[in-house]
């Protein structure tokens, strides 16, 4: 499984959406956010925040299938493309990912600081493009971070039966 640049991620997501539409297979995306990444960068420098993001990406990779893809759509965010995953499978992956990532702590100034991880889930529907799918996952992650600002949470769009 490779980490993708923003442009490669966009291309891969477009390909998977086209395949999902053509073949009728499901597709989900997870957006993993580190809510306190800007604070880490401001207080301890960009190097520490980059190291934290790289560590989260590495831990995330170990929870995924070989053909799932990870990319960085925005600051403090990692997007996971889950080809063939429907809503319930996406929720299972999101919860597993969150369980693993919520225990991560990063060392700064001799102290181990927790990362505020949120995971948002979006399931592709006919007529939804890549930007909208990412926006749905981002909105779900934002809802999750509002629910548990000091720890981690997972949320999915209302279409999957979650608030």
Predicted regions and their residues:
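Catalytic core regions of nucleotide second-messenger enzymes
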Residues: 71-74, 102-117
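Residue-level recognition of strand-loop junctions within catalytic nucleotide-signaling folds
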Residues: 42, 81-86, 102, 124-125
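Conserved long alpha-helical elements within nucleotide-processing catalytic cores of c-di-GMP signaling
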Residues: 2-17, 21-28, 35-61, 71-75, ...
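Catalytic-core segments of nucleotide cyclases and related cyclic-nucleotide turnover enzymes
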Residues: 9, 91, 95, 109, ...
